[in-house]
């Protein structure tokens, strides 16, 4: 059995342009669906966060409208409650990449607050690229790629084809106008070849060992692509 590392946010808010702290965390579907896919394939999951903080859940991600109705909302809430690893994270600072067969970053707006500027996560991402370790990143989690700054000042993901939560989706979600910055814009700024799909539809982009997904609906397909790469 191989171990797969989930790097998750420790932030329970996203600071908007006016200083307002918008409540957030990780998005349930983006953790639950890949967790189920990886464990069904026989892999062990280890969760890591900055400082070993228990990852806060974006409570909005349990709303019926995001889970196909009341039944779907209850199903994902029950599934999330059964994932004990989320309640017992290790410190990201103590992680040894060599211990893991793959690395996965679930989204939610939380990573826009902490992982986007976390140097430890940034180094882990650089090392994952260099070692060929399968790396999956979905929705807002590509914000973490912004911290992957190389010694020469460039970003390790410059030139990579990838995706992440789009400006169109952020606008439809109602937060684009109040955000300090938008993920799609920043990914383009670091030199990534951003691939935009239709809002809310699955969109997965694979470039070398990097697998990215645009939105919550892409989480399952990202996990499936990663499993093809995990030995």
For the regions a language model picked out, list residue spans one by one.
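Extended, subdomain-level signal for the structured scaffold at the beginning of enzyme domains
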Residues: 1-131, 144-231
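Conserved, well-structured core segments that form or line functional sites
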Residues: 135-136
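Conserved active-site segments centered on acidic
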Residues: 140-142
């Amino acid at each position: 059995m191989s171990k797969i590392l989930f790097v998750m946010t420790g932030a329970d808010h996203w600071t908007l342009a006016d200083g307002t702290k918008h409540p957030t965390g990780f998005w349930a579907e983006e953790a639950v669906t890949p967790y189920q896919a990886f464990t069904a394939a026989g892999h062990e999951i280890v969760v890591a966060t900055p400082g070993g903080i228990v990852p806060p859940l974006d409570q909005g991600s349990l709303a019926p409208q995001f889970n196909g109705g009341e039944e779907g909302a209850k199903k994902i809430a029950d599934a999330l409650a059964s994932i004990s690893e989320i309640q017992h994270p290790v410190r990201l600072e103590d992680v040894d990449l060599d211990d893991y067969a793959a690395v996965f970053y679930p989204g939610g707006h939380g990573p826009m607050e902490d992982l986007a500027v976390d140097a430890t996560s940034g180094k882990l991402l650089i090392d994952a690229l260099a070692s060929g370790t399968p790396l999956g990143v979905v929705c807002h989690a590509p914000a973490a790629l912004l911290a992957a700054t190389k010694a020469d000042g460039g970003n390790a993901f410059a030139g990579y084809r990838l995706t992440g939560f789009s400006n169109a989706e952020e606008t439809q979600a109602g937060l684009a106008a109040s955000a300090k910055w938008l993920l799609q814009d920043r990914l383009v700024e670091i030199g990534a070849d951003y691939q935009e799909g239709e809002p809310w539809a699955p969109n997965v982009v694979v470039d070398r060992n990097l697998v990215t997904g645009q939105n919550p609906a892409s989480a399952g397909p990202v996990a499936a692509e990663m499993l093809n790469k995990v030995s």
